[in-house]
């Protein structure tokens, strides 16, 4: 079983890169044009290349059922997270118009992607199963976010936004995988995609920090104790327990179980901050959820992952 120290050593560099991105933005070393360009580069080139280098031919996706489980759980577990967050928000005194909607979509969804990915790579060297499944799992997460999540925030879904570079890359990667066409891709093409894809992880983590830095404003700590405590209870307590229960008790492939254990330990996702800003939510609530769960998960995540992987054997 991986020890607390081993897992903490894998997590700490991720948070240091996030802190670096936040520092660069707060110091004004990232212009808005540079930041936008980096995000477009990651979304439209680097992330798709990473997906196309990890998914086709991945042993964990040998059976179609593995992809079905991953997508289905990504969707259902996020719906469960939204329900738990809505209930906890009501208990915590939040109401529609005072942050309940934003809290629900923020605390109800974990950072499933580029914070989890380096941990999966580090914890399972030589095994690309959990890493490849993460992107398939992400289809379900994104589907839940752009349907139920956006409906909670605005009253209507936004499926058009679901069709982006990574989504298209996942669909293409699954087609290549299950048709066997990936075997005929020249090595030079695969090597090039792998090189570009490896750039996606550090740059995306850096940009997570930059995005967090962008939304840090005066007054950000107003009502932070109530929101922060509620978010920890939901994201790192109730929702984490739901994800772990799925990992332990459903008839899942082993690599998907491992992925879920890591997912359970993750802090809240950062993208709801952007959604709250774009769709007249309350970005202050979203950034409080992200900041507090990120700090707390730095301590709790190694315990959760070590215990969860130990229980899986």
Locations of regions flagged by a protein language model:
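Alpha-helical transmembrane segments of multi-pass small-molecule/ion transporters
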Residues: 1-313
